[in-house]
Amino acid sequence: MQKYEKLEKIGEGTYGTVFKGRNRETLEIVALKRVRLDEDDEGVPSSALREICLLKELKHKNIVRLYDVLHSEKKLTLVFEHCDQDLKKYFDSLNGDIDMAVCRSFMLQLLRGLAFCHSHNVLHRDLKPQNLLINKNGELKLADFGLARAFGIPVKCYSAEVVTLWYRPPDVLFGAKLYTTSIDMWSAGCIFAELADAGRPLFPGSDVLDQLMKIFRVLGTPTEESWPGVTHLSDYVALPHFPAITSWSQIVPRLSSKGRDLLQKLLVCRPNQRVSAEQAMQHPYFTDSSNH
């Protein structure tokens, strides 16, 4: 740790405490993520270390840079680029109103970051406003990319805060174990709706069942016809048959018709029908200047 000076605590992350730090040589401000390792563990699994070291190669302006991996017996510290705030805090400062040009800019940057990582076969798996960081220039960056694969997604953060289900797709809620890039596209859709509504979450479920109910009340309950194989997923439960809503303008009133079209292409229950990040970036919502 000699290379970095620890400054004040920024907060609690999913995997441990986050501190503001300073590179003693360059004086650059960084974020130090102390990954809490299990007491009875053998230290850091070599597979996790390999995964983490691969992430140092992910260099893109919409991805939070991982500069360094500091590893000692019981401690693993990840040194990241520092950003001023996360999207959750940004929402809190909005007082319920967002400029739709900002909504569009953030969404495009989110998709660019996702497309880059997906092209390198790296999934996020736990996208939410808390790990989308924003700097003073209005640049949005994705944080904690690839960490879910290295460490797993805990059910509770070690600070005992429950990991949110609000951005999880129905296939994962039903116990699907084969993750593809589509998991991140669902989360991106939830975040898009939240952006368009100035920080009000689209599906704020209290538990897995409530989460599924909130989703299906909007999108309709899936069947074997609409989603072949859904009833064979390990945690599948039969739920009341809700029809899909017809008017998305009630769900996201501020979003233009093209924006609503993009949202509907992201929020598809059947994973292989969700649009990819690359495809979503080409959507007319981003090219039509009259779009707000």
UniProtKB/Swiss-Prot annotation:
The modification Phosphotyrosine is found at residue 15. The modification Phosphothreonine is found at residue 14. Residues 4-286 form the Protein kinase domain. Its EC number is 2.7.11.22. One of its GO terms (biological process) is synaptic vesicle transport. It comes from the Eukaryota. GO terms for molecular function: ATP binding; cyclin-dependent protein serine/threonine kinase activity; protein serine kinase activity. Keywords: ATP-binding, Cell cycle, Cell division, Kinase, Nucleotide-binding, Phosphoprotein, Serine/threonine-protein kinase, Transferase. The modification Phosphoserine is found at residue 159. One of its GO terms (cellular component) is cytoplasm. Signal peptide: none annotated. Coiled coil: none annotated. It catalyses: L-seryl-[protein] + ATP = O-phospho-L-seryl-[protein] + ADP + H(+); L-threonyl-[protein] + ATP = O-phospho-L-threonyl-[protein] + ADP + H(+). CDD domains: STKc_CDK5. It is an enzyme of class 2 (transferase). SMART domains: S_TKc (SM00220). Belongs to the protein kinase superfamily. CMGC Ser/Thr protein kinase family. CDC2/CDKX subfamily. This is Cyclin-dependent kinase 5 homolog. The lineage of its organism: Eukaryota, Metazoa, Ecdysozoa, Arthropoda, Hexapoda. The gene is Cdk5.
